[in-house]
């Protein structure tokens, strides 16, 4: 159960994170420039991965989505581990779990300041992607992280799954890349 402080922080984080994302998107669309990187495909990929490392976490983009998105990180975590970036993957997960515990919920996004928010809204795949990342990175949960995730799993089952284990017919964010 979230404390009053956590609830206030969560709401402030949600508002600030969403406003920042929208501002960055508009600014980059109309005033940004396209950067070109030198090298072959492998060298360009290495430059991008290195530049996405924020010091505490992997951000999703060099552009306007320059904060942590659980879904995007989940899709690349295994590849990052296999290409020698396991240390940064583990550090990202530790950082994300700390932010999630501080806000008392798992969300789709976390900004640089640690504000957790759902953009554009809650998503049914956020917690599963987090669990996937923990497995593929062989992350060793501490006691408080395990307790937090057990609570989040119970909350997830109540919110998203019916008594048969199927996803409830409710509205939630979807992966826009999959929409034709």
Task: Give the location of each predicted region.
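Aromatic-rich carbohydrate-recognition surfaces in CAZymes
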Residues: 66-73, 77-165, 175-179
């Amino acid at each position: 159960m979230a404390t009053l402080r956590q609830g206030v922080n969560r709401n402030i984080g949600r508002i600030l994170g969403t406003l920042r994302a929208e501002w960055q998107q508009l600014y980059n669309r109309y005033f940004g420039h396209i950067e070109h990187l030198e090298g072959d495909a492998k060298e360009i990929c290495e430059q991008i991965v290195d530049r996405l490392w924020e010091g505490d976490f992997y951000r999703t983009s060099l552009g306007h989505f320059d904060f942590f998105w659980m879904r995007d990180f989940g899709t690349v975590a295994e590849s990052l581990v296999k290409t020698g970036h396991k240390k940064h993957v583990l550090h990202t997960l530790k950082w994300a779990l700390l932010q999630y515990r501080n806000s008392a919920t798992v969300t789709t996004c976390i900004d640089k300041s640690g504000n957790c928010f759902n953009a554009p809204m809650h998503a049914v795949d956020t917690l599963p992607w987090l669990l996937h990342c923990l497995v593929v990175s062989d992350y060793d949960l501490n006691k408080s992280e395990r307790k937090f995730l057990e609570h989040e799993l119970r909350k997830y089952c109540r919110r998203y799954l019916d008594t048969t284990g199927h996803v409830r017919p409710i509205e939630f964010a979807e992966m826009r890349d999959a929409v034709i």
